[in-house]
Amino acid sequence: NILDMELGVNVFDMSDPTRPVRTARLVTPAMLSPHESLVVSQEGGVLAAVLGNPAFGPGIVDIYDVSEDCRNPVLKSSTPLGLFGHESGISPDGKTFFSGSPSTSTLVALDISNPSLPRPLWAGQYSSHGLSISPDGNRAYVASIGDPAGMLILDISEIQARKANPQVREVSRLTWDTVTIPQNAIPFTRNGKQYVMEVDEYSGGNGGPIPVGIHGPNVGAARIIDISDETKPKVISNLRLDVHNIANREEIASDPGAQNPTGGYAGHYCNIPTRVNPTIVACSMILSGLRIFDIRDPANPVEVAYFNAPVKPRVLTLPAPASNWAMSSPAFVPERKEIWYT
């Protein structure tokens, strides 16, 4: 937004998706550069973010009330309690906000049940990128850039219960052969069975993540993880495109945009429309656009649709090219059968 001279977080009324109407622009500290941390709890009526950037920011957390009118968020607090900022998570009830910074290996939990007076609950040394919280608030599913990179399942029940001096316990950790930079991990159930949908961003070399601007041979992409036994999670399927397969990487290396510093042929975010019996996963696959997978059989996902938006010139085109690539976490309007992304 700064590069396009649209400073801050812009709020739009999307009642008519063909004619979006901007209703507010949020320019408090965290909203000037929330990086990947912007989260909403519909149940709690809360919008929150932590000041961040591609490395890490100083951890200022902004909390807005959106319970009355989400088109006009009301600032409740702006405090330097996030320690360091890059990514985040929020409990479904909107009472706990997590500030994650993989570069500094810090994860902070804040009590935001009173959004005007947030308070620290816990801080730990985890290289957390994005994280999602279970419906009961007792588990955190962490996309970890630690050693090894992969997914962590953390027992955060003492934070949820607001115990004094809460302790967080590691339930399990998992990695995979194609791991690059784990981006986010989202739990869901399908026919009563528990899974996690996890996505890695960008590409890497055989020795792990490499600079984003390099067309690496190894693409993390996305996967479905069976967590029926949360102490022994296992990858049961992958959400990948042909351009992600190592055998094809050299052939496509000279394609326009393949060496794009913002990611080229790789993944960035995936999301599901519901955590209970979702039928699809939508993924922002950067240069490959929006890709839709049928996951009714989680062990055998099938790509069923894709969309590459028309090129729209930017005010500034360096380092990023004209914007027809997909980066954001897809959002859903199921009643209108819509998917939104940028």
Regions found by a protein language model. Give the residues of each.
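Feature marking well-ordered beta-strand scaffolds used for ligand recognition
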Residues: 1-342
